[in-house]
Structure formats: structure tokens, C-alpha cells
Amino acid sequence: MAVKHYKPVTNGRRNMSSLDYSKNLSGHAPEKSLLVILKKNSGRNNQGKITVRHQGGRVKRYYRIIDFKRNKDDIPATVKSIEYDPNRSANICLLAYADGEKRYILAPEGIKVGQKVVSGNNVDILVGNSLPLSNIPEGTFVHNVEMQPGGGGIIARSAGTSAQILGKDDDGKYVVLRLKSGEMRRILARCRATIGTVGNGEHSLVLLGKAGRSRHLGVRPTVRGSVMNPIDHPHGGGVSKQPIGRKAPLTPWGKKALGVKTRKTKKSSTKLILRRRKDSK
């Protein structure tokens, strides 16, 4: 999918870019039976208190019900359309099964309208097909990977992401995956995954260009703690551009913000991680 750049006719357009959806999407209206109303929470809980900062003010949208489980086995489906989904970075495609049911799935890279896909234990290794990790050869790139059998895909669902199968245990119970973050971990071989890489990989190349586009997405401004009052943030207070006055940066709630591992130490799945993800610098 090509990235469109605009002439600098205004300051907002000067550094703006977007994706050219006309060449890849079908242009069909979404399937009404797979739409539900998406309520705005603006980062508030049932008491009206902010639990997630920097959220609110996005445009109205419907939620598309996505089939992450891919549990309709041995029934072929035809890709009817490839559509835009405002709720995620990846595109989605509408499947029409032979028995008449319709479902949305994440659109893999290279999938075409009219293509056949199928789920099952012993299906072909083709893009869009879903099957257990135990039946997928080593070196294959997969996405929408389950962490619990039958629980639905959790790993590698964003645009352009995938996980690679590196090997299998001698007893066949676990499969070793390398994730996009660089982490290597063991997953139960009975978990399912979909062949291929998630499409719309150019999503990360888009520049919003102005604050208004970020507000349309529901992202509110991020205010630095050093310009707040002392009651609002540990970095607040002082005259003009003073240092934060602490040994290390802190979160708004007074905890160390840098260099601290945030993963719970007693999680049972820690023993399944063979190599930690690469630290971003």
C-alpha cells in the first residue's frame, strides 16, 4: 500500500502523509451483522475517574467483530472484500463460508479478493490458513498466535507484525517462537496460528502532520510533569526551567520511571521465556 504525500499548501499539510487505500481496499460498506456500537469511555472507569491518561474525543465508530479463534474447521471460505478497520492498524477481510456464515479476520499480506482460506488440523500451509503450531514447519512466519488452546489469537496482530517458528521440543509439547520484539518463548503446540504476516505494514510510515488528526484518533495531549504544579506531579514546581530535583525520573504516582522491570516476577509463564525482548534505545 503506497504512502501519499501532500503539497505544503497549509502548515498542517506540510508534513502530512496517509495511505492510499484505493488500490488495496474493496470499498464495500462493512457487514452490518458484524458491527456493534463502540461506547466511548475517555479513559474513565465506572466512578468517572481517569484510569488511562491521554484518551478522549475520538470520532464515532463501530466495532467490527473479528474472528481471532478461527475455529470453523474444514469449511472453506472465500475472501469477499478487504476493508479498513478504524479500531486497529491492520486491515480486515470478510470471509464468506460455504455454509453461508460470514466472519471478519485480520488481512494477511498478499491476500486477494476471491482467494480461498480454510482452518483445520491438517490444512495446506498457505497464507490465511489457520492450523495448530504442531503442524506448521519450522521457519514459517505466522500471526494471530494463541497463548492458550482455543483462547483466540493474542500474539502478532498489529499491522506488519509476525512471529517465526524456530523449533519444537522433543516431546512435541511446546513450539519455540521468535516474536517481533526479539523475545523467544515457548508456546503450547496445540495453540493455533495463521500463516503469513499481517498486512498494511506501511502503517508505521504515516505522519499525522497536525494535532487534529491525533485528536480524531482519540489521543489527547501529553503534558510534561516538569511544567505541572507539585501537587500534580513529582517533577512539578520550581521557577522557570529548573531540574526535576530527584535522583531519577518518576511516574505521576511516585514510582521510578526508567530502568525498572515492570513484569511480575511470580508469573508462571516466565519460565517459558527463553530470551527477553530487546530493550528499545
From Swiss-Prot:
Family: Belongs to the universal ribosomal protein uL2 family.
GO biological process: cytoplasmic translation
Disulfide bonds: none
Task of the protein: One of the primary rRNA binding proteins. Required for association of the 30S and 50S subunits to form the 70S ribosome, for tRNA binding and peptide bond formation. It has been suggested to have peptidyltransferase activity; this is somewhat controversial. Makes several contacts with the 16S rRNA in the 70S ribosome.
Residue ranges, compositional bias (Basic residues): 261-281
Organism of this sequence: Mycoplasmopsis agalactiae (strain NCTC 10123 / CIP 59.7 / PG2)
Known partners and oligomeric status: Part of the 50S ribosomal subunit. Forms a bridge to the 30S subunit in the 70S ribosome.
Gene3D superfamilies: 2.30.30.30, Nucleic acid-binding proteins, Ribosomal protein L2, domain 3
GO MF annotations, alphabetized: rRNA binding; structural constituent of ribosome; transferase activity
Recorded coiled-coil stretches: none
Stretches for region Disordered: 1-23, 224-281
Keyword Repressor attached: no
Composition bias type Polar residues, residue spans: 12-23
Record has Ubl conjugation as a keyword: no
Designated gene of the protein: rplB
GO CC annotations, alphabetized: large ribosomal subunit
Name the record gives this protein: Large ribosomal subunit protein uL2
Source organism superkingdom: Bacteria
